[in-house]
Structure formats: C-alpha cells, structure tokens
C-alpha cells in the first residue's frame, strides 16, 4: 500500500509542479500588443474593437484615475438596457502614454459612447455620389459602382486612425491610405470613405 501511494505521489507531484511552472490555466489575452496608434476593427458581425492611444506628456492632465473614469463611463453607458454593449478589455499606462482596448457591440454603440458620427451602411449613396478610386488607382463615382457584383458596404469617418475590416477594400477616397486589402489609414483631414465587400 505504501509503494502504491508513493507511486501516485511520484506521478502527481511532478504534474502539479509542471502546471505551476507553465502557468497552467487560461492566460490573459493581450488585445493591445504592439499597437501604438488609434485603431478600429470592424468585425464580420458588425461589432467594433477599438485600440485608443493617447500621449499625455505635453499636458498637465492627471492620468492617475483615468482607468477608473473609463470604467465609470462604460458602466453609465451600459446601465441596465445596454448591458455588455461596451467592454473594457485592456488598459496600459506607460509613462504618460495610455493605450486602451474596448469592444463595442455595434457602430451605433461606438458612436453613442464616443460622441462620433462614423457611418457604416449598405446604402452606397448614403454619403452622396462621392468620387473614389479603385485599388488599381482608377477614378470612379459611387453611382458608377455595379452593386449587382457584390454586397458592398460603405464606411466613413472624419478622424485619423487605422481601420481594419473583415472583408476586402474595393474603393477609397483621397483621405485614405491603403495598408493592405483589409486595412487602411484615415488621415483625419476630411471625410474619409471606403467601400468594401
């Protein structure tokens, strides 16, 4: 009987030590990573992930309570009828640089929480007959796009940030710099517009 207990302990003890050394269990996911500029991601289901980056080194702004302020604003917004509409995922503070990852259930929640009026629509003419370029650099107006080819969406914003989408950018205007087929940089100098599928 003693040998049997010794064998069990001899087996279980190393497994427990191994679990402790390798941090057995769920590791906390890193959302921000090395992102250091404002980034918005539109997921396939229409939800939004924002990485907001701000440098407060040139201001006298006291950032010591900023995380609590953000949590409080989220709690106020969500209340009882919008439970889970906005979630703080990660908060990083290094020197006077603050980076925050926040999830939003929809663009409507993003706009309401942030006081913005970004638009994402299947109505391509929602912004008028805007002049755009295709990915080859050819000029086209929205009215000239053949909507029978694909289910397009149009996104517009007037701020500087990187936009990532679950899809493929097909057309864009002069306030957009293309990073890849699913990522673009909005310059913040005017109303940036992309059409994607």
Locations of regions flagged by a protein language model:
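Bacterial N-terminal signal peptides that target proteins for export
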Residues: 2-12
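Mature, soluble, non-transmembrane domains
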Residues: 92-197
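N-terminal Sec/ER secretory leader and immediately downstream segment
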Residues: 32-90
């Amino acid at each position: 009987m003693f040998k049997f207990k010794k064998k069990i302990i001899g087996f279980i003890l190393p497994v427990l030590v191994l679990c402790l050394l390798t941090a057995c269990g769920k590791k906390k996911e890193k959302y921000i990573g090395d992102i250091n500029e404002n980034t918005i991601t539109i997921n396939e289901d229409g939800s939004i992930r924002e990485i907001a980056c701000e440098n407060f080194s040139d201001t006298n702004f006291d950032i010591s309570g900023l995380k609590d302020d953000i949590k409080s604003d989220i709690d106020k917004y969500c209340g009882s009828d919008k439970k889970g509409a906005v979630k703080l995922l990660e908060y990083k503070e290094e020197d006077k640089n603050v980076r925050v990852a926040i999830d939003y259930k929809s663009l409507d929640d993003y706009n309401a929480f942030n006081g913005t009026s970004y638009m994402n629509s299947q109505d391509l003419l929602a912004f008028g007959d805007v002049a755009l370029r295709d990915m080859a650099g050819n000029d086209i107006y929205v009215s000239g796009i053949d909507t029978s080819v694909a289910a397009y969406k149009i996104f517009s914003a007037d701020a500087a940030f990187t936009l990532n989408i679950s899809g493929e950018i097909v057309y864009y205007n002069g306030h957009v710099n293309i990073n890849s087929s699913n990522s673009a940089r909005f310059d913040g100098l005017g109303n940036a517009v992309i059409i994607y599928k």
